[in-house]
Design a protein with these regions (language model features):
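Extracytoplasmic/periplasmic substrate-recognition and gating elements
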Residues: 47, 71-72, 77-79, 101, ...
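Glycine-centered hinge/linker elements that transmit conformational signals in sensory
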Residues: 199-204, 239-271, 315, 319-320
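Short, solvent-exposed loop/beta-turn-alpha elements that line the ligand-binding surface or hinge
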Residues: 130-143, 187-191, 232-253, 302-310, ...
């Protein structure tokens, strides 16, 4: 089966999204293993692989993957080289710099959903792995098609899936606050709650000096799902035009958020909440606009701190269904890559399988602190470990594709959104709505008009 994707709309056209079904591809041949794990017959001896990553660092997941790989291949050494930039985009910059200096690790990751995948391909930084997949006999249907589809560009495969979810598609709610106010919570898989109702609840739940009714991040994932919740979008599918002035629904979406943040002041200003999950665990916010990973994090925090249900109980309120039947979301995913020109690419490929296989993916979720709904077997294991994971399947079944800047200006794109969305929503130094929205639009459009990265 051929997987095709473009930088303009990296999920558009995949069979899963078009059909709205979360199904794995039918297997076409017997895989070399049943779980995407490594084949000890396919590696060279005395090999050292350098693994440059910022994912999972400090959790023990990376070390566990290295140790178990060493058990399979005693003559192969994997050197973990953590990336510790102040942001994810900083870490991509570090990898570009390392490549320019001839020091990029054999194992790296230029994620599609952070808009670096196609740039890394165009700059000849990461290599296609089709021949390695074919020689290995790997069955790519072990991964869900939507996330395997992200690994392809111009008909060639460049990686294996790492993380994947449906983006900032939910309000993570403290059910105890709702119950205390007599507000009936919707079912966690329902899309029946309007944005108008969310706004009313945010005002009702807000307590001046005690807690905020709603917390909203100023970042690209939130900007996109905000506009989609109102039936609009942030940029076009081609990745060339910012829509927030021309699309009346997108304009209405930002007006709604501006009213809550600047006029009603029920949303915290930037800096007043350092960690959204921690603030919600502590009861400082009643709702947080996030995603499935945030739901899981808050539930884990509540349990680890033995917080009573009458004080804090995690709940999920999904964004509303759109007129076309799609659910407001932004299907996003990551990748594991091999550096172009790696001397031992066959051995590196075995390590890719080891971290992206069933056991690696389960650990990536439960230990590594990521959300990776990228494999049916791993997702089923997560549901068995905690049924809350069933809440997240519905939006994977009928989610919306993400749109990427056509010029691969990922860092500039995300930075512009964060900077000017922050200014627009600043209740301490108020900018008139029309002026702030114009500035956000113009600076995002300026990035989209840049030459390719």
């Amino acid at each position: 089966m051929a997987y095709l994707t473009s930088r303009r709309n990296f999920l558009k056209g995949t069979m899963l999204v078009a059909a709205g079904m979360l199904t794995a591809c039918a297997p076409t041949a017997a895989p070399s293993t049943s779980t995407g794990e490594s084949d000890s017959s396919a590696t060279a001896e005395g090999v050292t692989l350098r693994w440059d990553t910022f994912r999972g660092i400090g959790t023990g997941w990376n070390e566990e993957r290295i140790d178990t790989f060493k058990e399979l291949y005693p003559d192969v050494t994997v050197e973990l080289r953590p990336l510790a930039g102040s942001s994810q985009q900083d870490n991509y910059a570090k990898m570009y710099a390392a490549h320019a200096a001839g020091d990029l690790g054999e194992i790296c990751a230029f994620d599609p959903s952070h808009f670096h995948f196609w740039r890394a391909i165009d700059k000849d930084i990461i290599m296609p792995i089709d021949d390695l997949v074919s020689a290995d006999g790997l069955d790519v249907s072990e991964w869900y098609e939507i996330f395997m589809g992200l690994q392809f560009h111009n008909g060639k495969q460049y990686g294996l899936p790492s993380w994947g979810w449906s983006g900032w598609d939910t309000f993570v709610a403290n059910a105890a606050h709702f119950k205390a106010e007599g507000i009936e919570l919707p079912e966690p898989t329902s899309h029946s709650t309007s944005m108008e109702t969310i706004g009313e609840w945010a005002r009702q739940l807000h307590r001046e000096g005690e807690r905020f009714g709603l917390n909203v991040g100023r970042a690209e994932p939130g900007a996109v799902t905000l506009t989609r919740a109102f039936g609009g979008d942030f940029i076009n599918a081609e990745g060339t035009k910012c829509l927030i002035l021309d699309d009346a629904n997108a304009t209405e979406a930002f007006r709604w958020l501006y009213t809550l943040a600047v006029e009603d002041k029920v949303i915290p200003s930037v800096g007043s909440v350092e960690n959204a999950d921690s603030a919600q665990t502590e009861g400082l916010t009643s709702m947080n606009w996030g995603g499935s990973l945030n739901v899981r994090n808050v539930k884990r925090n509540i349990e680890s701190q033995s917080i009573a249900p009458e004080v804090n109980e995690v709940w999920q309120i999904l964004l509303p269904e759109q007129a076309d039947g799609k659910y407001a979301s932004q299907l996003r995913g990551g990748t594991w890559n091999i550096r172009q020109g790696a001397a031992n690419a066959d051995t590196a490929f075995q390590f890719l399988k080891h971290i992206a296989g069933k056991d690696g993916t389960i650990g990536f979720n439960l230990v590594g602190g990521n959300f990776a709904a990228v494999r049916p077997d791993a997702l089923q294991a997560l549901v068995e470990q905690d049924p809350i994971h069933e809440w997240f399947i519905v939006n994977l079944e009928n989610g919306q594709p993400a749109h990427a800047p056509a010029n691969s200006r990922g860092r500039e794109f995300t930075d512009a959104i964060t900077q000017y969305m922050t200014l627009l929503l600043d209740a301490n130094q108020v900018t008139p709505f029309e002026e702030g929205l114009q500035a956000l639009h113009d600076n995002v459009q300026m990035v989209l008009d840049m030459d390719p990265a």
